[in-house]
Structures are given as C-alpha cells and as structure tokens.
C-alpha cells in the first residue's frame, strides 16, 4: 500500500467530521443574525481554523503520474474523488451532501436514487430550493443511469429540466433516474424529484432528461481515469 493511500485512509474520518462542521457553519452564517462582537469572535475562530489547515495542496487523480498508481492507490483515489465531489462529497462542505444508491421503482425497473435534504442556505424563491441547485442534483443523479445498463464511460450531450412546482426546503427529497432509450452510442435517461406532501404522499416538483454519448474506446485508451471522476 502506498504512503498516500495510508495517509488519506487515516485522515478520512477527521476530514468527514471537519466538513460536517463547516457545512453546519455555513448554515449558521446564513441563518443567524448575531451582533458585531459575536461576528468578530467567530471570524477570529475561522481564521485560526484556516491557519491550522495550512498544508500542501491535495493532488487530484489526474495530477498523479500513472507510474505512481498501484491497485491500492487507485481505490483510494476513487474514494477520495467521491469524497470531494460537489454534490455527494462527504468531505466537501459545499455538498448537501447527496446520498446516491441503486434500487428498483414501483414497476420493478432499475433506478438510480438520490436522497437529500436542503437547508435555507440553498434557498432560491422564498422557502424553496434554488432551481440551479435542483438542476445540478439532477445532473449528478442522472450521471449514474448509464451504469444501470453497463454503458461504460459517457459524456453529457444535453440536459433539460422541467420545473413543475417549487421544491421545498427542510424536507427529505428523493430523485429517481432511469434509462429510457439506448441506440448505438447514444443513451437517454430521465429523472424526477419527489417531495413529501402533507397527506403523507409525494409529488413531483421537477423532471429532467439527459442525452449521454458513449466515449469511443480509442478515446479512452491512454486516458483511463483511475478515480472514475466526473
């Protein structure tokens, strides 16, 4: 096992905990209205925390020479890239974070499921989620759909969103994505966002459709991503 793999494995729990605290801090800064003394005290604490984090920059998977990558490090790079992703990364304080899994829908069809709860720091319209954030979550969840049919690496050719009603904050949201059509290198997937209703049911707040294009094998050769990064 490489030194990098050992180091990142050892720091992961602390990194996840730190990101949770920063995420909560962002929500508190957005929510609270303290006096100037409290603001100055908080600023000093944050400045001290930033000073404590002074260290060399973390290398991304694409910055690591192939000659340095063994099997253990490849696994670690994959995990590390996921940990820092914009929407589902547990170590990225900007991530909600989104929890992604696979399952089946009511018809028994395979789906990618994204579960998330958005607080007031993600607000767009009054007491509702920002539409751009909803679109970004759709993009992330839909990116898993090609793997349901073993389509291999793909790139997004088009993403369209239809907003049916405002998406509420501070509730458990569920995103579902499925493949609806595949022809040659092209694949179409659709998704929906479900929010709970007061009567115990759910309603669709937005829908999305994405066109993916498979990457030709010749384009993959010599450019494999050891971390499966998006």
Residue ranges: model-predicted function:
Residues 115-117, 160-162, 176-178, 192, ...:
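Residue-level recognition of well-ordered beta-strand positions that form the cores
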Residues 118-132:
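Short histidine-centered catalytic/ligand-binding loop motif
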Residues 109-113, 158, 172-174, 186-188, ...:
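Intrinsic-disorder/low-complexity, polar/charged segments enriched in Ser/Thr/Lys/Arg/Asp/Glu/Gln
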Residues 2-70, 74, 167-169, 180-230:
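HotDog/MaoC-like acyl-thioester-processing domains
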Residues 39-121:
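Long amphipathic N-terminal alpha/beta scaffold segment
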Residues 141-174:
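Hydrophobic beta-strand-centered segment that forms part of the acyl-chain substrate-binding groove
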Residues 103-107, 132-151:
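Active-site helix/loop of acyl-thioester processing domains in fatty-acid/polyketide metabolism
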